[in-house]
Structures are given as structure tokens and as C-alpha cells.
Curated annotation (Swiss-Prot):
This is D-aminoacyl-tRNA deacylase. GO terms for molecular function: D-tyrosyl-tRNA(Tyr) deacylase activity; Gly-tRNA(Ala) deacylase activity; Ser(Gly)-tRNA(Ala) hydrolase activity; tRNA binding. InterPro entries: Daa-tRNA_deacyls_DTD, DTD-like_sf. Transmembrane segments: none annotated.
């Protein structure tokens, strides 16, 4: 499971011209689910995202996590993060989870985040929808985080 986090001043996601979620200061997470991911990877990555220290402390160093900073989390499913880009000029998606598994694990991730951060501080995109994501990147600060099972996805 992969998550691209961006520290934001604000972020929102819209579907069919309607804003379905909006956050103020916090993290925008683009979440990619791979075919061998399980609930364990979802929980592990969630805890990693919420504890990752990307907000400034009193000395201006990145030393505070989103929870301690009082920030919010906007979770947007993005299957293209699971793409195989190792060869050629067209991405392959054989490493991406099937839609049913990806949707379930996306929901599990959101439930875990809501339980740990508080439901009022977690916004979501819409799985499978054509979404328009807007953000003001603060920094910019952007990191790719992955669950610990890296390397278990192999080509068939």
C-alpha cells in the first residue's frame, strides 16, 4: 500500500462539480492499494501517516504529526500510485488491487483514521469517481509512504 502525503493549508475534492470534502490545515493523502495488500497494511500505513512528523515545532523543524498539530486528513483513492512504471512509456496496472479489494481496504483505512484522529477531522474522496482535487501545498512538503510489505507484489 502506498500513500503520497502532502502538507496542505487547505484541500478539497469535487465530483461532478460538487465539493464532497474540504479540509483546512492538515494532510492530503493520495492512497494506492496494491493487489497483495491486507487490513494489516491499511492499519500500518494509517498509523504511519498519522504519526509522520511533517509539521513545524517551535524551532521550525518538522517534528510534529498531524494529530498533535490539530490538523485534518483528506484521503483520496488513487489506483495509479500502484502502477508499474519500470519499463516502457505506458504504465502497467497489474500490481494494483482489484476494485473490490481496493474499495474495501480504502474503507478500512478511512475507518482506522477516523477512529484515531476523529471522524470530524477526516474527509474522503469517492472511490471509482472522476475527482477534481484542489490543494494549497504548504512548503511544499510531500512524501511517499509505504506499508512494510514492499516487494511482495511480483509480476505474474
Amino acid at each position: 500500500m502506498k500513500g503520497l502525503i502532502q502538507r496542505v493549508s487547505e484541500a478539497s475534492v469535487a465530483v461532478d462539480g460538487e465539493t464532497i470534502a474540504r479540509i483546512g490545515p492538515g494532510l492530503l493523502l493520495l492512497l494506492g492499494v496494491e493487489r497483495n495488500d491486507t487490513l494489516n497494511e491499511a492499519k500500518e500505513l494509517c498509523r504511519k501517516v498519522l504519526s509522520y512528523r511533517v509539521f513545524p515545532d517551535e524551532q521550525g523543524r518538522m517534528n510534529v504529526n498531524v494529530q498533535a498539530a490539530g490538523g485534518s486528513l483528506l484521503v483520496v483513492p488513487q489506483f495509479t500510485l500502484a502502477a508499474d512504471t519500470s519499463s516502457g512509456t505506458r504504465p502497467g496496472f497489474s500490481l494494483a488491487a482489484a476494485p473490490e479489494l481496493a474499495n474495501r481496504l480504502y474503507g478500512d483505512f478511512v475507518a482506522e483514521a477516523s477512529g484515531l484522529l476523529g471522524a470530524g477531522r477526516v474527509g474522503t474522496g469517492e472511490f471509482g469517481a472522476d475527482m477534481k482535487v484542489a490543494l494549497i501545498n504548504d512548503g511544499p512538503v510531500t512524501f511517499m509512504l509505504e506499508s512494510g510489505q514492499r516487494g511482495s507484489c511480483t509480476k505474474m
